[in-house]
Curated annotation (Swiss-Prot):
This is Protein MON2 homolog. Belongs to the MON2 family. It comes from the Eukaryota. It comes from Xenopus laevis. Residues 516-526 have a biased composition (Basic and acidic residues). InterPro entries: ARM-type_fold, DCB_dom, Mon2/Sec7/BIG1-like_HDS, Mon2/Sec7/BIG1-like_HUS, Mon2_C.
Length: 1721
């Protein structure tokens, strides 16, 4: 219609009026001759127009009101049937209509006039034009007028003139459109005024047409009649129709339905028409198409089937398309039928053209995803409904399959290769001969599909996403067109692609909307789809969303099987890269969509299809599960056994780009990869890269495929897990074309990017990826068992890559990731292990390097999580794994050492996880790490970790693979202890804080903390741990380690022990030191005595260390000494401890055990330790000499070879001396107060130990077994030297019993012989009067005792006799050396010979006891001189015992081993008697000395008249000196005994007298021995005896008659004996004649003569009253006998005789008679 603005403007109105007038004038001119009425009417009209123009303000309205009159002239003109006039009139009428100045009445008149012209066949085109203008410019034509106008157009359509027909057809279409447009306009006009009825949704009863508004009614009537006409029924409204075609009717119906769907949807009347008229009509008209089967025999059916008619069928399909598209919601049931029909039309038995238009129709549906969604909701989701959507998709699939199964009749359908006839490859064939280039037939010239010999080209039919049909648009065709080869397949292919694209876009859009509505934020990244967890789509709380989800799922479930079947077939058949790309993209899209919706089975099915496409033909059959339906229940295997090597026929046209080995346990040849395989692989990579978040469990499928492809292509892992092309020699049968070679880096890059993109996956998806890789790796591991073939490392490499890019959330995947890699590290295949370790250590290092939020230093849990796998590697026995682990630790220390913090325990645990079976190199590497820790990182680690450092250092000490490391580790322990010392305050503070925290936590949990050395303070526990570890090393099997550890332990305790709390010392003593002593003692006593030949290599072992026993002895010595030193230096700390007494006892027990050891070294050292704890060796005080603390210097371990594992750390420099640190940090040691340590119980315990040691060690052996152990002299010396100091502490309570015990030990000690081996070093030469150290010690011990007794209380002095007894025993050794049990000892003189035979068997040599005995004698004499008057000495008959003791050497005299002995004995006797005799005389009445006198007499007798002979070489001077000694004895008798004869027992005096008589002459015996003669030659002695005798007889006043009698008898006997000797000599001389008498006889007579001379002299000197007269008579009676001797021939006798006779001159003057008388009487 014309615009109002253009027709109502003044200019337009003016122009209209002018034109009207002009038209009327022209009409008047034309008709003035032939048609006067018309002329008049025209002129009348001119006037009318003028009047209207002149009078009316609104010209157009006025014209319209008078239009019937205005138009009348023109109508009349048309009635003339004159062409020119008619044309003029029609033009004028059109002008009026265009200005909308025609009223309804006028319009009716015009239509009637037009009808007449039509019936007359005039101006047909003008008529059509006029009708069109009339209906389009205004809405005044209704009802019958409108009907008549439309019929007029229809009638003109069926003329014989094509132009008219076509113009009429176009006019009809336009008119029909105008009618409906009017209705739409009418609805728009009234929509606000009147509420519209609700759109119809189902069957409703027909409402009365009268309810419709005018335009609506016209439209209704028109549409109804169109249906009638198409159905070949009479119209109701279009009265006058004479002819109609169905094709045209269907076109009109389609245009109305397509252009005005809202009319039918908003008006029930129209909806009713659709349901009741249109749908049945369509179904009815479809009937021929449904029933017809191409190629079926007509005779087989009862009635001939009508052949489908292309124009109608095609138009019906168009109508159906519109119905489905526009009115699906109204016609649910009907559409179900239509859709089912569409599907049927695809059947193979339908004509090609029908299938083509059907597939085009379906294509139109496929580009409408919302429509498809509706189908799914309305049909597929209803319980008992046809699954329409599924059927459509399946039908497309079947259709495509059928095209390959039934070759089309076109010339291009000839097959290029018979099925199965392509070249196949066998395992033995040369892979290069199977055609590495494209096939040579025409099949590759055009894009096409080829399957089993059927070749179908791909045609370009429409642009993506549109359904531009070809045959549905052929409205002008009457005959069925020829469908070109490939057209239907190409459309069907596009149907599939558009279907996938459409539903994917729609569902993803709805998902996105659902997310937005549910406020779910999806994290997006470039080139990645939003990663949504399928389980979260959409939020299930919203029922609407639930509904949406169920629709999406149903759509997928309905279509995926058909889609997959079709796409898989097409993928297999495709020879075109673009087509393949589209197919793969569709499959990928579907897989992604299924993944988003959590539909596992379809997702896996599509992925499987892509995977199959990626792998060589038939390879996939064993790798992937071919059953799509059951795919979700299957596990995907990568094993690939039984791979079929036959190339299928469908791939003969494919370009082979690579030939390689399959990944299988037993490869049976080679497999080929085509360009399509590589293309599929890329799609697979793309899928995983972009849609990894939705893969879930199908990751395994994807990765398994990629692994096989990577293997076939020869890609190998490199650093970081990226895959790089392997070396050319990797596989002898791997052949790669140039094309694929250039692709490999790209594929490798995409692979890496794929795993890099895992950082954008959500957590669940990431877990799926990790699980899949782990599963894949497990299978690769299984394949590698018992197989030397290179394993597949794909999974391990990609686990590494995945881990590295997901460090920001490493926690969620760490455990499964590292857990699996640890399993890999345990695999027997070295290459597999190597990569497992590489991956694991790289991840750990990367994890520690990564900047986590919060930082690792603040996230202890994460740090421990990262380090834990490193620790778990320690459990793996493989050498290479441990090496890798330790390399990793070293790198961690170097890069992260300062920030490890809470991770230290784990790292240290790894370093310390050493085992002896690991070999030297591993231990060296681990030790290198430890050295670095100790030198560089002690200050940075938490103090709580220091204990672990100690444990680890200790474990290196204990390992037995590398001695130098053990020794160096002990040095490290010293450095560690020094560090503890330097930073003691800091460490203690940190440990205490930690302890408080632990105690608090334990209290909250209600548990008790259980820690070693509890309840010592934490810092002390640290020290105790260090000590305990050193203690363990002290009992190592290697001597060097034991020695170094022992030195370090005691140095550490000595240097740093002051830091310990007082109470902790209890633990040190009991848990460390005593425990160590126990272990050392046990090991020492059970050590092997076998000789060790050498120390390995060229090292010679000293004989003192050539058995394990001797080596352990050294350890025992060191340990005991160390403990004793601690007891000594720290006693002020130890003594206040609760159990010090018990500890003291234990220590003494250890000392005793050691002292009684069979090892001289140990036993001697034990005594030194004993001395130390008794403080015989006084300890150096700290406050006196701070620089020289005992044991402060750190021991330097002895290195047998170089230690190459020195860490790259800095040495720990100690800037200050330990003494300074001690004074700075610790309280100075207090001097030990006497009262502190004077605890008698301790000292008595020591005494008891000493006694037990002494008793056991000096006990003589029972048998003379060669193996008898004899204690050494140094040992015994040390033992005895202990006593004096010990005695100082026990002297107050030292009893007689104790003294006797002591005596036994002293006696035993000096009785012990020495080995001939040792004698040259201990024995003095026989001539030297030197005491051994032992003998000196023994005498010193006794000296100490006697001095204490001397100054001690009275009750102590009873011990004197015991001391004398002891000394007496020692004195006796001079003559009778002690026997040590039954042991045979050699005399010292014989031992000299053995000193030369160095290697002769050891013999036992008795010591030279003479000096010792003599010294003892001197001591005894000295002591007696001091103590002679003591009551105990008197009471216990000490003097008698002394004399008895002296009697032995005196009686032996010349027979004594040493001449000095008897001489000393004599002098000692003289000294003793000079003191003792006065005491004896004092106590003579008490009888206490009664037994002493006979002993003394015997002693004198034995000495003065010894039976021993002097040696032959005795000189005269010596003899005279000896005689002088005898004289001294006699003088003692004359001075000390005889003067006091009245106080002395008479028996004793008698014996003395007899002895003196015997001494004066010796001529009583009848035979003279040499000895007697010698004695007799002691003239001076005889003289003294005689003089003494005489003095004794006459000098003293006779106090008793008995005494005088004894004197007289003595003289009488003397004279009688002289008389007898003289007589016998005279007689013998006479008988001898001239022969001289024996010398002894001559000597005897000379002696007698001298005695007579002496007697007379003595008698002269004696007071006369003392001489009995009888004596004088006897003297004088000798004279005659003397005279008789004058005849003797011996001059010597003559001389003596002369001397004897001379004194008789005094008898020549007789005395007074009275006196003589008296004398005779």
């Amino acid at each position: 219609m014309s615009s109002t603005s253009t027709t109502s403007s003044p200019e337009a109105i003016k122009k209209l009026l002018d034109n009207m007038q002009s038209d009327l004038r022209g009409l008047s001119m034309e008709c003035k001759k032939k048609f006067p009425p018309v002329k008049e009417a025209a002129e009348s009209g001119i006037v009318k127009v003028k009047n209207i123009a002149a009078r009316s303000p609104d010209v157009l309205t006025a014209l319209k009101e008078n239009s019937s009159e205005v138009v009348q002239p023109f109508l009349m003109g048309c009635g003339t049937k004159e062409q020119k006039i008619t044309q003029l009139c029609l033009a004028a009428i059109q002008r009026l209509m265009s200005h909308e100045v025609v009223s309804e009445g006028a319009a009716g008149n015009i239509i009637n006039m037009l009808w007449q012209l039509m019936e007359n066949g005039l101006e047909e085109l003008k008529l059509l034009q006029t009708v069109l203008v009339l209906l389009t410019t205004n809405t005044v034509v209704h009802d019958e007028s409108l009907s008549k106008a439309i019929v007029l157009c229809f009638r003109l359509h069926f003329t014989k003139d094509n132009i008219t027909n076509n113009t009429a057809a176009a006019t009809v279409r336009q008119v029909v459109t105008v009618v409906f447009e009017r209705m739409v306009t009418e609805d728009e006009r009234h929509k606000d005024a009147v509420e519209q009825p609700i759109p119809v949704t189902g069957n409703s009863n027909r409402r009365s047409v009268s309810t419709l508004k005018p335009c609506a009614k016209d439209a209704y009537m028109l549409f109804q009649d169109l249906c009638q006409l198409v159905n070949a029924d009479a119209p109701y409204w279009l009265v006058g129709m004479t002819e109609m075609t169905r094709t045209f009717g269907l076109e009109l119906l389609e245009s109305v339905l397509n252009d005005f769907p809202q009319v039918f949807l908003q008006h029930q009347e129209f909806s009713f028409l659709l349901k009741e008229r249109v749908c049945p009509l369509v179904i009815k008209l479809f009937s021929p198409n449904i029933k017809f089967r191409q190629g079926s025999n007509s005779n087989s059916s009862p009635a001939p089937v009508e052949k489908p008619y292309f124009p109608i069928c095609m138009r019906l399909l168009r109508v159906v398309s519109v119905l489905i598209k526009q009115f699906y919601s109204l016609l649910v049931t009907e559409c179900e039928i239509f859709l089912s029909l569409l599907v049927k039309f695809l059947d193979a038995d339908k004509p090609q053209w029908l299938r083509a238009v059907a597939v085009e129709s379906i294509h139109r549906l496929c580009v409408q995803p919302q429509l498809l969604r509706s189908f799914c909701q309305s049909y597929d989701m209803k319980q008992h409904s046809t699954k329409v959507f599924r059927d459509i998709v399946n039908a497309l699939g079947s259709f495509i399959q059928s095209l390959f199964l039934i070759p089309s009749a076109g010339p291009a359908s000839a097959t290029t290769n018979p099925p199965g006839g392509s070249s196949s490859i066998t395992p033995a064939s040369n892979p290069t001969t199977s055609g590495m280039a494209t096939a040579t037939s025409n099949t590759t010239v055009l894009p096409a599909f080829e399957y089993r010999g059927t070749w179908i080209p791909i045609l370009t039919i429409s642009i993506q996403g549109s359904a531009k049909a070809t045959y549905l648009e052929m409205l002008d065709k009457v005959e069925p067109p020829t469908i070109p080869e490939g057209y239907a397949l190409s459309v069907a292919f596009h149907c599939l692609l558009d279907l996938v694209r459409g539903i994917t876009t729609m569902i993803e859009g709805e998902i996105g909307q659902a997310e937005t509505d549910s406020h779910i934020s999806a994290e997006e990244t470039p080139s990645h789809a939003p990663t949504i967890n399928p389980q979260e789509l959409p939020a299930v709380s919203d029922p609407a969303d639930k509904g949406c989800r169920s629709v999406w799922e149903e759509m997928i479930n309905a279509c995926w099987c058909g889609l997959l079947a079709a796409l898989s077939l097409l993928l297999d058949a495709s020879t075109d890269e673009t087509a393949t790309e589209n197919i793969l993209k569709a499959e990928m899209t579907m897989a992604s969509l299924c993944g988003k919706l959590g539909l596992v089975t379809p997702r896996d099915a599509f992925i499987t299809a892509i995977c199959k496409g990626s792998l060589p033909p038939h390879y996939a059959l064993t790798v992937l599960n071919t059953s799509s339906a059951a795919i979700c229940n299957k596990s995907y295997s990568i094993q690939g056994q039984n791979v079929q090597m036959i190339s299928p026929s469908s791939d003969s046209h494919q370009q082979v780009v690579a030939v390689g080995q399959p990944l299988a346990v037993q490869p049976q040849g080679t497999v080929m990869l085509t360009a399509k395989n590589i293309q599929c692989m890329r799609t697979l990579l793309n899928l995983a890269h972009c849609h990894g978040g939705f893969l879930g469990t199908s990751w395994q499928l994807v990765l398994a495929t990629l692994q096989h492809l990577v293997w076939i292509l020869g890609l190998k892992p490199s650093s970081g897990g990226a895959l790089k092309p392997g070396r050319a020699v990797e596989g002898p049968s791997t052949v790669l074309t140039t094309a694929v070679m250039t692709d490999l880096p790209i594929i490798s890059n995409i692979l890496s990017r794929l795993f890099e993109s895992s950082q954008y996956l959500d957590d669940v998806s990431l877990h799926h990826l990790i699980n899949a890789l782990c599963s894949l790796s497990l299978e690769a591991m299984d394949m590698a068992y018992g197989n030397n073939k290179e394993p597949s490392l794909f999974a391990v490499a990609k686990l590494l890559e995945t881990g590295l890019v997901n460090m920001h959330r490493i926690e969620i995947l760490w455990r499964p990731l590292t857990g699996h890699l640890i399993e890999v590290c345990q695999h027997p295949n070295a290459r597999m292990r190597e990569w497992g370790a590489e991956a694991l250590t790289s991840l750990i290092k990367a994890g520690l390097d990564f900047k986590h939020e919060p930082q690792l230093s603040e996230n202890q849990r994460l740090q421990l999580l990262l380090l834990n796998p490193l620790k778990e590697l320690s459990n793996i026995i493989h050498h290479d794994i441990r090496l890798k682990q330790l390399e990793c630790v070293l790198q961690i220390l170097q890069s992260q050492g300062d920030s490890l913090g809470p991770g230290w325990p784990l790292v240290l645990g790894v370093i310390g996880a050493i085992r002896n079976d690991q070999g030297e190199s591993l231990i060296r590497n681990a030790f290198q790490c430890l050295q670095l820790v100790v030198t560089d990182f002690l200050p940075t680690m938490p103090s709580t970790c220091l204990q672990i450092v100690v444990e680890v250092a200790g474990s290196f000490g204990l390992q037995n693979q590398e001695l130098n490391i053990s020794l160096t580790s002990i040095g490290l322990l010293w450095n560690i202890s020094d560090y503890f010392y330097q930073r003691g305050e800091t460490i203690e503070k940190e440990l205490n804080l930690e302890e408080d925290l632990l105690q608090k936590q334990a209290k909250e949990k209600g548990i008790i903390l259980n820690r070693p050395f509890h309840p010592a303070p934490p810092f002390d526990c640290l020290w105790l741990c260090l000590y305990a570890k050193l203690g363990e090393l002290c009992v190592d099997i290697r001597p060097a380690v034991r020695k170094s550890a022992g030195q370090t332990l005691f140095s550490t305790i000595g240097a740093h022990g002051t830091l310990l709390q007082h109470a902790t010392w209890h633990t040190v003593i009991w848990k460390v030191l005593f425990q160590l002593l126990n272990q050392v003692r046990e090991s020492s006593t059970t050590a092997d005595k076998e000789k060790i030949e050498s120390g390995g290599g060229n090292i010679l072992i000293h004989h003192s260390r050539d058995t394990a026993e001797k080596q352990w002895a050294e350890t025992w010595v060191l340990t005991l000494a160390g403990v004793a030193r601690i007891f000594n230096t720290r006693r002020y700390l130890l003594q206040p401890l609760g159990e010090f007494t018990k500890a003291w006892d234990v220590l003494l027990d250890h000392i005793q055990s050691a002292a009684l050891s069979k090892s001289n070294e140990v036993s001697l050292a034990a005594l030194k330790s004993f001395q130390e704890i008794l403080q015989i060796v006084s300890p150096t005080r700290d406050n006196d000499k701070p620089e020289s603390l005992p044991g402060i210097s750190a021991p330097v371990p002895v290195l047998i070879g170089p230690v190459n594992a020195s860490g790259p750390g800095r040495p720990l420099v100690r800037s200050d001396s330990t003494g300074e640190r001690l004074s700075r940090y610790s309280i100075p040691e207090q001097p030990i107060a006497v009262d502190e340590i004077e605890d008698s119980a301790l000292w008595w315990a020591a005494w008891n130990t000493w006694y037990r040691i002494g008793t056991e060690s000096t006990k003589p052996p029972i048998s003379c077994d060669k193996l008898t152990f004899i204690p050494s002299q140094p040992f015994l010396t040390a033992l005895i030297q202990i006593f004096p100091a010990l005695y100082q502490h026990i002297k107050t309570a030292f009893s007689m019993d104790d003294l006797q015990k002591l005596g036994v030990i002293l006696h035993g000690a000096v009785s012990v012989p020495i080995s001939s081996d040792a004698s040259p070093f201990i024995l003095p030469s026989y001539t030297e009067a030197v005491l051994t150290s032992l003998q000196e010690s023994v005498l010193t011990a006794l000296d100490v005792l006697q001095k204490e007794i001397c100054v001690g209380p009275e009750n102590m002095q009873i011990m004197y006799p015991a001391i004398f007894d002891e000394l007496s025993a020692f004195v006796q050794f001079s003559c009778k050396p002690p026997q040590y049990g039954k042991l045979e000892t050699k005399h010292i003189a014989n031992a000299k010979y053995n000193q030369i035979q160095l290697f002769a068997p050891a013999e036992w040599v008795a010591l030279n006891y003479v000096p010792f005995a003599e010294k003892s004698l001197e001591v005894m004499v000295d002591l007696y001189q001091k103590t002679a008057c003591h009551k105990a000495v008197v009471n216990e008959k000490v003097l008698q015992n002394v004399i008895k003791t002296l009697r032995v050497p005196l009686s032996l005299k010349y027979a004594c081993p040493s001449e000095s002995t008897w001489k000393l004995a004599v002098s000692s006797l003289l000294k003793v008697l000079s003191v003792g005799l006065p005491v004896a005389r004092q106590h003579v009445s008490s009888g206490k000395f009664d037994s002493m006198w006979p002993e003394l007499a015997s002693t004198f007798e034995d000495f003065l008249f010894t039976k021993s002979t002097p040696p032959d070489n005795l000189s005269i001077e010596e003899f005279q000196r000896n005689e002088g000694i005898d004289v001294e004895v006699v003088q003692l008798i004359s001075m000390e005994i005889l003067p006091y004869a009245n106080f002395i027992p008479k028996d004793f005096v008698g014996k003395i007298m007899t002895m003196l008589n015997k001494g004066s002459i010796h001529s009583q015996s009848s035979s003279f021995t040499e000895a007697e003669i010698d004695i007799r030659m002691r003239e001076e002695f005889s003289k003294v005896c005689f003089e003494t005798l005489l003095q004794f007889s006459f000098s003293n006043k006779v106090t008793t008659p008995q005494e005088g009698y004894i004197s007289r008898m003595a003289l009488s006997v003397l004279l009688k004996r002289s008389q007898d000797v003289l007589h016998r000599y005279i007689e013998d001389e006479k008988l001898s004649g001239k022969c001289p008498l024996p010398r002894q006889r001559v000597t005897e007579i000379i002696f007698v003569l001298k005695a007579v001379s002496t007697l007379i002299d003595s008698l002269k000197k004696t007071h006369p009253e003392n001489v009995d007269a009888n004596t004088w008579a006897q003297v004088i009676s000798l004279y005659p006998t003397l005279v008789e001797c004058i005849t003797c021939s011996s001059s010597e006798v003559c001389t003596a005789l002369k001397e004897a006779l001379v004194p008789f001159k005094d008898f020549m003057h007789p005395p007074a008679a009275a006196k003589v008388q008296n004398g005779e009487s």
